[in-house]
Design a protein with these regions (language model features):
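N-terminal beta1-alpha1 ligand-phosphate binding loop
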Residues: 1-34
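Hydrophobic/aromatic beta-strand patches that form the interior of the parallel beta-sheet core
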Residues: 4-6, 35-37, 64, 104-106
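Short, solvent-exposed amphipathic alpha-helices that sit
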Residues: 17-28, 125-139
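Generic recognition of short, well-ordered alpha-helical segments
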Residues: 17-21, 48, 76-80
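A short beta-strand-loop structural module common to alpha/beta enzyme folds
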Residues: 32-44
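Structural motif
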Residues: 43-51
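Helix-loop-strand module that forms the ligand-binding subsite of alpha/beta enzymes
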Residues: 51-134
Length: 139
């Protein structure tokens, strides 16, 4: 099973020990069936190449999105990536390029897990806050 890991962290090299370590360990494994991409290194000025991303996604059986949780959401490049890559006619609206693919999220936060509960400081669970990704995964 081939796995595509897309890392969306704007400060991977200079601001996130956890995400940088995850990326380093994944890359060090050197598995033939795992592709790890630092999307901010690929697209430092944001124009995402949808054709390249489509090819990578089509070739993968499993897609993992790794990102920090910013303001109860994902970083700007991941939002741009979604707008440019997960398009009508390709992923939905007659297109089914992602059908049957497994989607996983690896999300880091600067807060305790206890804050992401109904009775926690944020009054919402992580599952609720990440539900848009679930909708995309099962479209």
């Amino acid at each position: 099973m081939s796995t595509l890991i897309l890392v969306f962290h704007p400060h991977l090299k200079d601001g996130s020990r956890v995400n940088a370590r995850l990326l380093a360990e994944l890359t060090a494994q050197g598995e033939d069936d795992i592709i790890v991409r630092d999307e901010y290194a690929e697209y430092p000025n944001f124009p995402v190449n949808a054709d390249t991303e489509h090819e990578l996604l089509e070739a993968a059986d499993r897609v993992i999105l790794q990102f920090p949780f910013y303001w109860y959401s994902s970083p700007a490049l991941l939002k741009e990536w979604e707008d440019e890559v997960i398009t009508a006619g390709w992923a939905y609206g007659g297109g089914h390029a992602l059908k049957g693919k497994e989607l996983k999220l690896v999300v880091t936060t600067g807060s305790d897990a206890a804050k992401y509960r109904k009775d926690g400081e944020y009054s919402h669970t992580m599952e609720e806050l990440l539900s848009p990704f679930e909708v995309v995964a099962y479209k």
